[in-house]
Amino acid sequence: MSQLDSNWSFVDDSKVTPKGFLFAGISAGLKASNKKDLALILAPEGSVFSGMFTQSIVRATCVDICQERIKKTSGFVRAILINSGQANACTGNLGIQHFQIATGKIAELLGIKEEEVLMCSTGVIGVPIQINDLVKNLPNLVSDLKGNNFENAAEAILTTDLTLKKVSIETIIQGRKIKIAGFAKGSGMIYPNMATMLAFLTCDAGIQKEEWDKMIAIAVQKSFNAISVDGETSTNDSFVGINAGEKIEKRFFPIIQQGIDIVCQNLAKNIARDGEGANCLLEVLVQGAKNTDDAIMLAKSICNSALVKTAIHGCDPNWGRIISAAGNSGVKFNLNDVDLYIGNAQILENGKLNKYDPQKVTDYIKSRMKGRYLVDDIVKIMLNLNSGESKGTAWGCDLSKKYVEINSEYTT
């Protein structure tokens, strides 16, 4: 266990997951590699679901039906089925039928209502789910449900990802252990405002739907909506947060919000760092903004700039690209007030070029390109607008030739 701050600590998710939640992850033959490709989360009775989904107008079947079911049940859902390999997007009525067949069978096996089952899919767009393989393996999936199968479920949702993306934390409130655990997938087609990513969060502190929705929205805005790999948005983006358990007093909500933020930001940074072909994480902090929305918007603009990303990959301290991306963000600021840092080197002071050693900045970026994963492989950029008290952070990665290779060979 490692300490995060005064409230939350990381825990081993193979031993500690939110009370009452069960997880499963198996191979159903949906991927040619025979890797795990089918996951299931079963929540306790009375659980509360909140979901946020892709903002693309081209949406997968699962996105629309999941939103409908969350609304119809007022968030009282019990299970999430997740498949990887086929996105079930742009598949017409067949996609709807496959969704209904799969969720109907899971509901039957679990003894719950079909409307209490959600389904999320990820994979190749336009390819229908291999429904026969999926359905025949659902009994095995249900049999695999265990509290400590969290990692299997996390593994089963991956596609081009190179690493597992999972985190579990706990704290004690009034003598009671509270746990929050989440896992995600995402490596390419990642752009601020939810993009080709799936993420799931579970929490064993009971919170009513209205408050839970607010907490999830706040966390997503500061995490999954603040990352960029390549500026592409997907058809299947989904984030679902679930809570269940004994009700928590409202005065402790800020602690729960802090925990949700920690999990979501941890997963978001993992997604950004695992960008296809990436060698480092790019972290942009904007300070001195008039409000948080402006700060995040400006930070995202820098993270999403292909010119900034390629400069970082080339270890080129091309600060002009950074300030240009800031200027294109839509956020109003006075250049004459701006301070800019790359690492510890101050590049601009009050909008004017400061004396700095470009080679030291190049060496700083090079060292981060060779650093340990999410430890010292983070290139930090800080922009201070000096016009307010608010701040915001966004994350991205370098853009490499490897990204082009991966996506020129991957069937879309």
For the regions a protein language model found, what residue spans apply to each?
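Generic structural marker for isolated residues within well-ordered, non-membrane alpha-helices
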Residues: T103
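A structural signal for small-residue-enriched, beta-sheet-centric alpha/beta enzyme cores
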Residues: S2-N83, N88-Q97, A107-T412
